Each structure stands twice: as structure tokens, then as C-alpha cells.
Amino acid sequence: MLEQDAQVTDAELADAVAAEEAAMEELLVRLVETETTLGNEEPGQIVMREAFADAGLEPRDLPLDTDAIRGSIYSSPFSWDVSGKANVVADLPTAGSTGRSLVLNGHVDVVGPASEQLWRTPPFRAVRDGDWIYGRGAGDMKAGLAAIVGAVRGLRRLGLSPLAPVQLQSVVEEECTGNGALQCVLSERRRDAAIVTEPFPAAITLAQVGVLWFHVDIAGSPAHVGEAGEGVNAIEAAYRLLSGLHALEAELNDDPPSPFDTFEHPINLNVGVVRGGDWPSTVAAECSLSCRVALYPGTPVVELQQRVEETVAAAASTHPYLSAHPPHVRYDGFACEGTTVSADEPLVQTLGGAWERLTGTAPEHAATTATTDARAFIQHGIPAVCIGPHAESIHGVDERVLWPSVVQTAQVLALFIRDWCGLAG
């Protein structure tokens, strides 16, 4: 095999990837129909091991190492057991060492379907309707994993190998901590760039917010409902705290920095889970709120944690019972800062060029009010961006992905690998 660039055109690469469309769709269907919510990721990783092997690669596991993760300043706290969880990675055979190395990353885990009764089709059954494929995780982000595999299958079809290391990663825990991608960064050799195929169509993400999950435990005083005035309802007391937290949210949105000043409301507080009480005829003795709030790049997580704690304490001080029995704030899940990448990065320029040549239109440079695993690479000095298929209703009802955009993403990745790494055959 010659250590030189193969003379392969954009059209030849795109056609080779398109020839793998059936295999990509089959993989996406299998992934969607394999439930991979938190704690149930392994069945999806079995599918990804098989997909990597079917593409001619040798998959290997990267188990989550609790001590290594918790020892990193970039980890998010977690209270659950991660033993037995593993990322799955595969390295492309190389034809030389003259190019730039690369990671192609996607996450296999998904959020739950919420109320299945609201879905037009069962959430864990992949249903194609015209150019759309429905199902939980179809867009976020199992289609991105299918695109990664499709790009590699296209290269293998042409008998081409990169002139630098290229690693494919299927990671866990993107939806709750980001510790899966962090484990890859901690365990594997440094790469020159990373692309995460999150569903950001026709846009390269250069900035993303950080995210903080926090939980507020509120103690009330139980009583028989016939003597409700003798007790303190913890659920009702929670309203006082929520009012204060939404006031904090408004403050955080007062003067957003660029590029988040293009959003009407870039910092979103979400009360995602409320648990409280144990009996309809008993004044609720306890209530817990599980919340998510965002933070701008440059804001330390500890600074936002302090503001949350001060806000909860201030709101509690105005309540006759909570002022003497203050709520407790704890952290479990996301605790990550925002990140940015320069538009002048060679990664951004090269990826934009590949997209424009394939589609005829230059991709936008975008910011997102969510967080992604690109963060783990950026925090370790590895330029990383997101670009991927067109998806709708992610985390919502009737999530779906536009199938032609999945094929297009795979084609762009193949062109990018040629431009970034070089190819030989």
C-alpha cells in the first residue's frame, strides 16, 4: 500500500457512501428498536460492536473507570453504579502517518419517551414514513452513529485507508453526565480533532452552554389532612423556591454574551422531576425538585452553584417554616462548563469546505443552548465541533430524523476524512 494520497474524487466518495445506504438504515432501525435509556445502554453497544465489526473493524470496550472519572476536574458527579458500563471504540487501519488524526464520536444512550400514549407510533419501534424515520433516539443521536459507520463503509468499499489514526466512538452517558466521552479522552491517545454527529444540520457548532443539574430536598411537617393547619406541606412550600429560581433564570438572561445574544432566551431553567408526599390524606412531609439550568462559556460551575444555593436560601428565608428548616441543595448529574471553538480552526474550515462542495451551500456557524460531548475534547485542548442530520422533536414526542440528511452527513464525513487525514489504497 502506497503512503500517498489516493486520487479519489468527491463524487466517487459520495457514491460509495450512498451505496451503503441500506446498511446504514438497517443499523439505525436496529439502534432505535434497542432501548438504551440510562442503565440500559449495553444492548445498544452490542449493536454497535456488530456494526463496527461488519465494517471490517475490530471493536474494543473502554469500561467506565469510576476513580479515573471522579479524579478529573471535568467530570460530572454521579450517584449511580457505572460498573459494567463501557464505551465501544474502533480504529480504522491506517495506510501511513502523514495526515491529521481524528475522532468520530456519537452517543448510544437516549432519554426516556415520557408518555408513550402521546406518540403516533411506539417510541422504540423505528417507523419510516416517506423520508422520515420515527422513534426515540432516531435523531438524538443514533442517526449520527449510523452516519459515522456509513462513511467508513464507503471508504472501505473503495479499498481506502486514512493516512492518520481515525477512531470511531460509541459512548454512554451523554444525556446525563458526559462522563462516557470523558473516559475516552482520558483513556485514548490524543487526536488532532473530533467531530460529534449530533443533529445540527447545515451548521457547525462553535459554542455551547454548560449545564448544571441540581436537586433541592424540602422538608415539611406531616399531619392528618383533617388538621392540615397543624402541618406544613413540603410540596406547596416548593412553589416559594421555584419563584426564586425563575427570578434567577431571568437574571441570567438579562445580558447574554455573544454568540448567545442571538437567542431570545439562551439560559433555560427546567424543573424536570418533582417527587413528594406519600399519601393523599397526609400533609406532604417531603418534596424534591430535580432541575436543570445552563451557564455561559467562561462561567465556572461553582459560581452558578453558589448562586443557586443563595437563591434557594433567600427564598426559604421568606417562608415561616423553611426559614427554620432550610432546604438542602445537592448535585448529581451534569456539572459542566460551556465551551467555544474559533471559526478559524483548521477543523472548522476543512469541514465547512467538505460540506459546501457536497451540498453547494456553506454551513452556518452556530451556537447551541444545549451541551454536547464535544465539550470533553475541547476541555482537553482538542478542537471539536458538531454537525449532523436534520432531526425534529428530540427529547419530545414523535422524534424523527430526515433520512436523506443522514446519508448526506455520512458523505460529508467521508469527504472530510479524505481532506483532513488523507487516503491511500
Where are these regions (language model features)?
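Hydrophobic/aromatic beta-strand patches that form the interior of the parallel beta-sheet core
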Residues: 60, 102-104, 193-195, 214, ...
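Acidic/His- and Gly-rich active-site-bordering loop/insert found
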Residues: 2-133, 157, 162
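Metal-dependent amide/peptide-bond hydrolase catalytic core
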Residues: 1-12, 54, 206, 213-425
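Acidic/histidine-rich catalytic neighborhood of metal-dependent amide-processing enzymes
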Residues: 133, 139-213, 421-425
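Short beta-strand segments
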Residues: 105-106, 170, 195-198, 217-219, ...
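Active-site catalytic microenvironments for nucleophilic, acid-base chemistry
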Residues: 34, 151-158, 244, 248, ...
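Short, conserved micro-motifs enriched in small and acidic residues
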Residues: 131-146, 159, 232-236, 400-407
